[in-house]
Amino acid sequence: MSETAGKGVTMPEIMQSSYPDETLYREKDDSIRPSRLDDFIGQEELRENLKVFLNAARDRGQAMDHTLFYGNPGLGKTTLAQIIAAELGVNLICTSGPVLERSGDLAAILTNLSKHDILFVDEIHRMPITVEEILYPALEDYKLDLVIGQGPAARTVKIELEPFTLVGATTRIGLISSPLRDRFGIISRLEFYTPEELSQIILRTSRILNVPITKKGAIEIGRRSRGTPRIANRLLRRVRDFAAVFGSATVDEELVNHALQKLDVDEKGLDQMDRKLLTVLIELFAGGPVGIKTLAVACSEEVRTIEDIYEPYLIQCGFMKRTPRGRMATVKAYKHLNLTD
């Protein structure tokens, strides 16, 4: 990378890049996800336990117990569902809670499952209660109870289902009803990743996308990726764009720093919205405490977006804390933003 580009003084002419055509990137994006458990990086304890459950299911020749993954977005819940299906050599049928509006929608999916298939339901906490209720006998006895007709002529029909495994994913496990949650034999939480684990993921992705990157460059991206592989891979792709424009053959630490500065991602991984949340909390509400709804209105953001996307990382980093009276900024947040307490 040129000295001028590194300082961000002027944009160079767009140079002929040595990187492959962008269509090749799009074709390779689908292969970023690991397909085997041994290729999955991070979540060590969960991974070791899952290996035991998979081997036990294979040895018994039975469907694996119903599994619920929960944790913040982008930590690998969908990837693990795909890995389970690949490891067991069965089909993976994917849907999501909001899509299943009527019980008939779920019944149609369940009756078409083959033996030991995996049914993956993302955002399972958003599944309507009427749909959820027909799942109970399906999960316990592999039977479907359907009501045909109306009024006095209505009758119940039992349909036998093939043994299957339900894999649910949620960012809000507290919104799943107890009857449904209790029917999962395996419940696993996905934690944020360490910068070292994220750097390994970035190095793996860079090999798949044919983007040469130094170890220091990968570590720097990992350090700013909010503990989330999805964000790490997204930042790598954006840094790749800067490398292509500047004609850099290799993504190094200098280029990463320049690109992330342009993308407004600071050394702690906070973006513009993270800093806005903290700044509003400090400057408008004297650091808090303030209710989440009031904070959301002040930031022109939805409550759920703050709770699911921004708040978990800010709390984990020690920039924000929850109290019975509302959210508060910490001393660490004041120092990070160079504001006076």
UniProtKB/Swiss-Prot annotation:
MF term (GO), any: four-way junction DNA binding
Residue positions annotated to bind Mg(2+) are 78
Where is this gene product found?
Cytoplasm
EC number of this enzyme = 3.6.4.-
Q: What Gene Ontology terms for biological process does this UniProt record contain?
A: DNA recombination; DNA repair
Superkingdom: Bacteria
Q: What is this protein called?
A: Holliday junction branch migration complex subunit RuvB
Q: Which organism is it from?
A: Lawsonia intracellularis (strain PHE/MN1-00)
